[in-house]
Amino acid sequence: MDLLNTLPNIWPLISLFKISLLPKEIKEPGSRLENVHKKLEENTTKGLQGKATELAARHLRLSTYLLMAMFTYYLTPYPDITLDLKDESNRFYILYWAPFILSRNVIMVGSLYSGWHYFLYENKTMRGKLRSRKFDGRNLDENGDLIPAKGYHWKECAFWSINGIIIESFYECMVLQYWLTTKQTYTQFWSRPLISVLSLLFVGYWRDFHFYFAHRVMHPYFSTKSKWRNFDLGRFLYRNAHSLHHRSYNTGPWSGLSMHPIEHLIYFSCVFIPSIIIPQHPLAFLYNHFHVLVSPLPGHDGFGDPAGGSKFHFLHHAHFDVNFGTPMVPLDRLFGSYDDGHRHKTD
């Protein structure tokens, strides 16, 4: 059992291994949200937003997305970016790659989401080991089976998630076509060592910085009593787009990418924007690409360590007006929306 404490919780492989070491539990999941706040007394996120411990844990998880990027880049390299697009036969070369890119993303990412959902919510052995680690057990019945109507309609979430993968695949094709047209990217990683290394190091920070502001703009800013409420862009975006994501108030794996297409376009711009502004090696692009596609999965799975879920973001879904960003970049502290589990605590 010492391995549970000594091994880093790298999702998903180490997480699965650590779950397998857990004894089967008979303890019922918590039935009240107050239990969540009580557990947060020992939460590693508490008081650590932006500090070394949280950053170390975050970067260990980032290694999963980097490995996915390396696997994809070296096994299925992108088309030759030195093609002469003046040649009519090459002008729409990316169209030949679009079906492959879409298939690769749907299979790779969809398999991760469906597999993790199965392990946590369908597999009886795993369920029996993790029940007491469920943040809010009100959507599980007495046998541990999921009750979709209580905050996690996983089939509906899966539909919108697949839509999101399609939209991100479209963005990926646009970036490749842009690279073919402008020759802005480069294929030799060490030909520009400084920008190559820095772009990899800052992917996580950029994604979390972008996520906070992209997320915050989709929540109301003015109160319902404010005279400015009719001019509130956040209220409009929440009502017409982001509210779909918040249908999952007791989240599961498929909740992460369950978004309205408008929100998908905003969320995945995190990958598109830097790719057309700065020279970027395809490996850095893929790293960012898989980060935005896969990180919502463990972040929404609804369970604490070692399953890999995020209590920080769970509190956002539970309370709506807190924790818009991530623990890695302390923007919630800066703008006054940080909650370590006590802000909405009830007696």
Predicted regions span which residues?
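Non-catalytic, topology-defining segments of multipass membrane proteins
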Residues: 1-270, 325-328, 332-347
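C-terminal transmembrane module of eukaryotic multi-pass membrane proteins
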Residues: 258, 263-347
